[in-house]
Amino acid sequence: MSGANPARGEATLCVGDRLMTVRPSFAALVAAESETGPLLALVDRAAEGRLTLAEMEALLWHCLVDRPETMARATLGEALLAQGLGAAMPAIRAILRQALAGVQ
């Protein structure tokens, strides 16, 4: 992997021993929205500090690039807790920013 490109709205996220790229593509955001509900409502909840762990996991899961087929979703959830939710916030912010503003 060549790393995240912030100009494309990408960020990095450490999952276990892997540094992975998070890319909030249209398809990924549609998939996440089908699970979490409307993205604008999700952004509102995030702004109010009411984003749930399940919502964070869903956003990240659908936006992970080149996710190994053998990776279980629970692995992502465990990584979020192991490193602390604060470590995932740059990637979450990148996803929400992309949903609101698009790529500049």
Q: What feature does the model see in each segment?
A:
Residues 30-32:
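Short Gly/aromatic-enriched secondary-structure transition segments
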Residues 23-24:
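Short linear motifs in exposed loops
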Residues 52, 56:
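Hydrophobic (often cysteine-bearing) scaffold residues that line and stabilize catalytic clefts
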Residues 57-65:
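Short, hydrophobic/amphipathic alpha-helical patches that form generic packing surfaces
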